[in-house]
Design a protein with these regions (language model features):
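Short amphipathic alpha-helical segments that mediate assembly, nucleic-acid/protein binding
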Residues: 116-120, 133, 216, 258
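Short, structured coil/loop segments at alpha-helix boundaries
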Residues: 37, 45, 76-82, 89, ...
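Conserved kinase catalytic-core segment
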Residues: 43, 120-187
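Conserved ATP-binding subdomain of kinase catalytic cores across diverse folds
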Residues: 1-111
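Intrinsic structural disorder
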Residues: 1, 15, 134-135, 267
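A broadly used, surface-exposed interaction patch
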Residues: 103-127
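C-terminal catalytic region of ATP-dependent kinase domains
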Residues: 56, 163-267
Length: 267
């Protein structure tokens, strides 16, 4: 939607790394290896900041996103203000530290014996007891509500991750990859909301899901009280970035459109 240069200020914090560390990981994600943590790197997209902030408000775990400066010759592996950089022509991307914790088994949506991705009910059936099943279902429904509000178009096997703890309880891992959202032009002509766990083909499909999972209705209604522009401003301010006025107008319009959609769903 915009370049990082439109948003930078002298106070913007940038994490500096050396370019030679950059490579593809096993999932073809660009990443940088450090001695302590792996950093996933992608092109600048401020929707990641907003998705993260919405997750914080809704108590949904998410990846943390920050600016990364690549091929900087001094003071690597630390944050530095943009005004303090000797070379301000460096390549600035978006980064997030690997959120995986030791002792937990992380996995993506599994395939069944017919080589098809398993559905919501099948992933829930992997839970060891009813308590864990209900916990995981609530976590997934909260993801559904967030994504519907944000207009997420690609919540699929590449960006849905789960983890299993030492008690074999299964939970949704932190959410990440919000870049295909907050943009009406990205809307699929086939799906209102595309998720590999459950296909919401239209509003009626969502209503049918709500008839047996009322939590989705309440979660969607909670977004009617959220001001997307305020969320965007907060997420930019926390990173000492400026938000272009044209983008503010876009977020205001998008917020209005999504709230009209939610009202149609929950009425």
């Amino acid at each position: 939607m915009m370049s990082v240069n439109e948003c930078l200020t002298d106070e913007s914090n940038i994490y500096l790394i050396k370019g030679k560390y950059i490579k593809l990981d096993e999932n073809n994600h660009i990443c940088a290896e450090k001695t302590d943590k792996k950093i996933y790197i992608k092109n600048f997209n401020s929707t990641e900041f907003i998705g993260e902030e919405l997750c914080h408000i809704k108590n949904i775990p998410s990846a943390h996103y920050f600016l990364v400066g690549i091929n900087y010759s001094h003071h690597r592996n630390q944050f530095k203000k943009y005004s303090k950089l000797n070379d301000q022509s460096i390549s600035i991307k978006l980064g997030s530290f690997d959120f995986k914790k030791d002792g937990l088994n992380y996995f993506k949506i599994p395939y069944d014996l017919c080589n098809k991705l398993i559905t919501l009910e099948k992933i829930l059936s992997l839970c060891p007891n009813k308590k864990n099943r209900n916990e995981l279902l609530d976590e997934i429904i909260d993801m559904f509500a967030l994504d519907i509000y944000m207009g997420q178009q690609d919540r699929n096997e590449s960006n849905i991750m789960f983890y299993q703890d030492k008690n074999n309880y299964i939970h949704l891992a932190p959410l990440y990859d919000f870049e295909f959202s907050l943009n009406n032009a990205l809307y699929s002509s086939k799906f209102l909301y595309d998720n590999d766990l459950y296909k919401f083909k239209d509003i009626n499909t969502i209503k049918e899901f709500i008839s047996s999972h009322e939590r989705l209705k309440y979660e969607l209604e909670s977004y009617l009280d959220i001001n997307l522009l305020e969320i965007a401003r907060k997420s930019y301010n926390e990173r000492d970035l400026k938000i272009p006025s044209v983008i503010e107008e876009h977020y205001t319009s998008f917020d209005h459109i999504q709230k009209k959609l939610i009202k149609r769903i929950v009425k």
